[in-house]
């Protein structure tokens, strides 16, 4: 469920030619999310095994898009799990906001169709991985990247009521 003109923005193949990797330009528009998905600080990195066609999804925290207006422009594979990600806004320099980040999914949690997240259920028809009965993007809503990551970490905490 992508927002109009906010789809898969970059594609790359890992150096060993085993995996196609893409990244969504911004957050997915999930059920229950009020307004635009653009200011939600979670995009997705999607991997597809070229041998088995297995799909995995990983959350990528955008740098405060509600404030910075950034979205993802490109992704480049440095290894099977390490990527350069270009975030940018639509402004020209010197006011523009353009940065390149390193994203490492080596120890990241798959939130895609094969997700095995404690307390989570994957429902493609309802926006993907559900935590506390809501899709991830709807759950974190419009917030900072730090607040979104903190919220997701608190859900994974052994003291959370769903554990």
Regions found by a protein language model. Name each.
Residues 1-163:
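Sequence/structural signature of beta-propeller domains
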């Amino acid at each position: 469920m992508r927002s109009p003109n906010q789809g898969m923005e970059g594609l790359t193949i890992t150096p060993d030619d085993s995996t196609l990797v893409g990244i969504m330009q911004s957050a997915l528009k999930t059920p229950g999310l009020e307004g635009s998905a653009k200011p939600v600080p979670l995009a997705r990195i999607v991997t597809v095994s070229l041998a088995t066609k297995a799909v995995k999804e990983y959350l990528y925290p955008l740098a405060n898009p509600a404030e910075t207006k950034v979205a993802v422009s490109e992704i480049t594979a440095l290894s099977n799990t390490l990527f350069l990600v270009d975030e940018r806004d639509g402004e020209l320099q010197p006011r523009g906001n353009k940065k390149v980040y390193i994203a490492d999914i080596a120890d990241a949690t798959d939130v895609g169709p094969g997700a095995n997240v404690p307390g989570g259920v994957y429902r493609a028809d309802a926006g993907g991985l559900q935590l506390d009965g809501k899709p991830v993007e709807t759950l974190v809503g419009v917030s900072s990247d730090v607040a979104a990551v903190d919220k997701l970490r608190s859900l994974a905490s052994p003291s959370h009521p769903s554990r």
